[in-house]
């Protein structure tokens, strides 16, 4: 499923869209981890900038990337007008690399390398804005044709207003679009595949697509897919977060890190406060941060790492920011983002459960 977008080159206004069913040959596979240091905003806007060892396949599409970056910035600015405030990428994405296993299944003893990819980098922005255009365009198109889809919506950006999944094309305040379907990652998410089936019906049948689409309005199976996906996606995210936490704690041990700079972001259990490390993907509770506001920056002494429960505690050594000057506070994300953090694993053991007798484990 391809979306073709016609853009006025001078004004960057989208003047038309067309969806096609086709096979698309890949001319160049551009990877963030290999090219972000080359594809900077300066490189895209100033043709005189030349960087040593730039791949020819990248030079061949430099003009196209420059235009796409201009378009992406314009699209982002338009969404921010609808949102009412700019999007902030205060925290980076982290990449993990395990050295020493030659691509085999990890054993837990590998050397961990953690690198940073700043969100909002030019290539990242181009891809993100293209996906938003596709997902919002297809979502609105399905709604116009009366074809149900699976949407994510958010009524407002007021505190406590969460993102919801449903079958109606409703505004997504957090993104700043009239509707937002998930359709651009069918290999990664089943919901996207379902939406693409609906979009294919729209392409093939036009105004009669609602009669031919696999899922009809108020289809109980569609609601069941949403319910099942929510549970599966939460479980997937939890597993991913736990896995990243394990390797982050291994990194802390391997590098002999005993102190970290961190930022307070919310109250934790037992009178502790949760902090987020400034330079690692790590959230943990600390003692001694009582009555400190969100955004307070601290130097923290780390306790022992528990590799079974993935637990780690810290103690405040000193406050690094000026209490009377908010300009040096640490980054504070939206409340919903703060909820998606990985913490220790809770282990429940039934001491009354009788083990099955076997030659290796005879009954008493």
Where do the language-model regions lie?
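Electropositive polyanion-binding surfaces
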Residues: 1-296, 305-312, 327-344, 348-364
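Short, compositionally biased
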Residues: 314-322
